[in-house]
Amino acid sequence: IRWHNKRNEESNKGDKRDESGGRLLKSCLLCDKEFKRSEDFRELILLKTKEEWICKECKEKFEAISDVHCPKCFKDKEEKECKDCKYWSKKGNKVQHEALYRYNEAMKEYFKRYKFEGDRLLGTIFANDIKKAMKKYKSYTILTTPISHEKKEERGFNQVSTILDYGDIKYKNLFKKEDSL
């Protein structure tokens, strides 16, 4: 699925080869700096390539959640259930959330550009990470959260289903957003 947005009509627009004509140079979707796609020996043997969308420097700005985290909300560096989850549990609310990355300045900027500035191609950045994390939910039916007609018109896309589409993750649209009073 391709979509016209402020960036490229095609995801490979602007890609070129390095001086030797070998490795593919890409433009980072976040900073526009050119970078060489890394090559993995397994990729060469299996003839499968892993698409890279951002440079190493930008990727390093996103902080992965460590193995030490709240078991309910994935708040980083919490060895047991965090105080927020305890609070909500006491109120009768079940907290069960999984996160791959911390919400830091890089993630904040990413969401600003992706959701609010309509840069649909940024949905590619985390699609493979999400696909990998979703493998343990193979038997589940994934449902998307609907957005209002106005938001879809404004953005031009549903941000959740777009990431799922880029990750080739199957899902269903069973819900519809009703206009609120």
Predicted regions and their residues:
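Glycine-rich phosphate/pyrophosphate-handling loop used in enzymes and phosphotransfer proteins
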Residues: 1-181
